[in-house]
Amino acid sequence: MTVNRKKFIHTLSFSLAALWVQGGRMLHARTKDDARISDFCRKLKPIGRALELPGYYVWCNSPIEAPDGKTHVFFSRWKADLGMSGWIKGSEIAHAVADAPDKPFEVLETVLAPRGTGFWDATTCHNPLIKKIGNTYYLFYMGNSNGKTNTKRIGLATSSSLDGPWTRTDAPILLPGAAGAWDDHCTTNPAWVRGKDGRNWLYYKSWNTHDYETTKGPIRGNRKYGVAFADKPEGPYEKYVHNPVIDFSAKGANRQFEDAFVWREGDKFKMIARDMGVFNHEVGLIMESDDGLHWSEPQIAFQPLSHYVQEPPAPAHLKRYGRLERPMLLLEDDQPAWLFGASQGGKYQTSSAFIFKCEV
């Protein structure tokens, strides 16, 4: 068979050019995809599940290091017979301790339980966030009074020791906005940080009631984040006039997020959270800011749980199986050292903590 040399060279050149273009596209796509993955995400090493408790769902695992070097966690739990939705109408906040984040945890006690009729936290205590500010431990949390979302309010308990006793505020420390405001439905998911101005900055999640009641689709309403400021951790808090500071609704498709944790790293404010459609519903988000008010476009903070571990197929009663929620950090010298999250599944097919080491 005779091959025309000129035709062969032309065909080869065209093929190489096509491969170069295709390769370029592939490289561009890979580079574009890689740009979505944060350095934080690349440094995560999965440790595994913790706080798998028989008869309970476990959620919202907030860690802190004690003066003796032990790791304490304040977490939400509710009876398994309430199902996954029991967090809204029967959650309590408990306390556990371990020699280190990757060692077994011992549950010590319930520290905050719903107080019953007449109290703002009558029906649930959830979303714990433990902080040491000065010589006092501050346990921020969300409570409600009717077992529904529209009475979710951020409150506070304080103690001079991680072992208590804990004194609660008589009223919430941050209330929803006026009717019609973007945040008129509730205040929840507290995230505290010391601002560059030395004041107490409290980030919170909320949404609009009308949107919540009229939105069609699997997720009702659009969750946004605002911030409020106070001279003291217990308040009174004054909301930032240009709230919300993070709002993904303009991206379309009801994109939103929740479960933010905020910290200061050098001159930057940083935030880690759970994605609700910006990339997908299975990953985490990470953002940064120079001033805590204007935030960068998000990158991926962590992958779906299946990226790190192989688990049994999802049981029918767990609809949010396979993803990490409620990300919380244990910091060392203001740097992320450990990531604590919550995930459905585990030994008792309820939910538990899931821990990562943040490798330097």
Indicate residue ranges for each PLM-predicted region.
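Carbohydrate-active catalytic/glycan-binding domains of CAZyme proteins
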Residues: 2-360
